[in-house]
Regions:
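Interfacial segments of alpha-helical transmembrane regions
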Residues: 1-15, 63, 67-87
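Alpha-helical transmembrane segments of multi-pass integral membrane proteins
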Residues: 106-136
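Hydrophobic transmembrane alpha-helices
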Residues: 80-87, 132-142
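Core segments of alpha-helical transmembrane spans in multipass integral membrane proteins
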Residues: 27, 41-65, 85-93, 122, ...
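Hydrophobic alpha-helical membrane-associated segments
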Residues: 14-21, 87-91, 95
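Interfacial loop at the N-terminal end of multi-pass membrane proteins
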Residues: 2-59, 100, 104-117
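Structural signal for the C-terminal ends of transmembrane alpha-helices
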Residues: 66-70, 140-146
Length: 147
């Protein structure tokens, strides 16, 4: 179980990194002009692969939740972590992914680009907060788990 706890912690922590970067960049990006925003968005080329980390974190947290189901408090905290990770996936596919599709991954700027920018930025910021809660909840679960 210790190895799985380690994997869950590492993957959940790594999943927080890109969303945290988006959260902290938001104040600097939200008011950029169309051309400057398009340039800034090019920074994220290839970041889609980081979705693998998020899915891995969710799977590791799922397995860990099953393993600690006999320990009420660690189970609840681990379940919260798992549900938070699943919520980030739901938010991504409900808000971020459609904005990426509408802008061809920010290589084209449609007429409603400002609304799409807001949708994209806020969905990432929201996910940063949710993954932080997942990370904290997982940490509490790990601290309270009996071997």
């Amino acid at each position: 179980m210790r190895f799985l706890q380690f994997v869950a912690m590492v993957l959940t922590g790594l999943a927080l990194v890109p969303f945290g970067a988006h959260l902290f960049a938001l104040p600097n990006k939200i008011h950029l002009s169309e051309s400057d925003y398009l340039i800034a968005q090019n920074i994220y080329r290839g970041w889609a692969l980081l979705g693998i980390v998020l899915i891995g974190a969710a799977l590791a947290n799922f397995a860990l939740t099953i393993l600690v189901r006999g320990q009420r408090v660690p189970f609840v905290f681990n379940l919260v972590s798992l549900l938070c990770l699943l919520a980030t996936l739901a938010i991504f596919f409900a808000f971020t992914f459609p904005a990426n599709q509408a802008t061809n991954n920010w290589t084209e700027m449609p007429a409603n680009w400002q609304q799409l920018r807001w949708q994209w930025e806020i969905s990432h910021a929201t996910n940063a907060v949710i993954i932080f809660v997942a990370f904290c909840s997982l940490t509490v679960s790990l601290l309270l788990t009996q071997e």
